[in-house]
Amino acid sequence: MTARRAPAVNRDGLEQMLVEGTTALDLALTDAQHNQLLDYVALLGKWNAVYNLTAIRDPKQMLIQHILDSLSIVSHLRGRASARVLDVGSGGGLPGIVLAIVEPDWQITLNDIVQKKSAFQTQMRAELKLANLSVVTGRVESLQPGVEVPEKFDMIVSRAFADLSDFVKLARHLVAPGGSIWAMKGVHPDDEIARLPEGSRVKQTIRLAVPMLDAERHLIEVAVDEAN
């Protein structure tokens, strides 16, 4: 299948935006990581029409609403020398591919139920040379440690997967001891938090500041009881 041509974009302009954004987020990235992130934006634009990855077509808005949005959670997830991370409902690879680029010591698994999107994720693994990235297709509630995935995860993240209570119900069996579920949300999800299932609780709520984005963003960390 042939990719349609993406909108023309000045890579230097995008690079300047990315540098400003990562500086605002206090993230020190290498030149190689900056280039990988810019390559990822270009590939999202190139293959979007084929894989139906995002409604956003403008590369600058892709950088802001996808890349910087995903980068805004990095400092809050850090604290482990290495970590096993599952990105549920990853779609075009967000935030998982961004995490794999900026945290090469983490093992990132992308999960989606749509085979076409998994195919794109696998292609990104090869094109961006992400040895720490793996892809698994299927419903998250059907994934079993030691079968579809090697083991349980320290962090399970989602950017646009489901209602928070549903996310916790479906993914909790994959949380490793001491691990957490992390949900990226827009406005503060009071109603969703009120419906959290028994044996789960909010550990912290973080208001995110995404550079160049005038919109509310929150990161919710949920702990689950190991017995559940």
Curated annotation (Swiss-Prot):
Gene3D superfamilies reported for this sequence: Vaccinia Virus protein VP39
Record keywords, A-Z: Cytoplasm, Methyltransferase, rRNA processing, S-adenosyl-L-methionine, Transferase
Cell compartment(s), UniProt: Cytoplasm
GO cellular component, one term: cytosol
EC numbers, comma separated: 2.1.1.170
Single GO MF descriptor: rRNA (guanine-N7-)-methyltransferase activity
Family membership: Belongs to the methyltransferase superfamily. RNA methyltransferase RsmG family.
Record's protein name: Ribosomal RNA small subunit methyltransferase G
Originating gene: rsmG
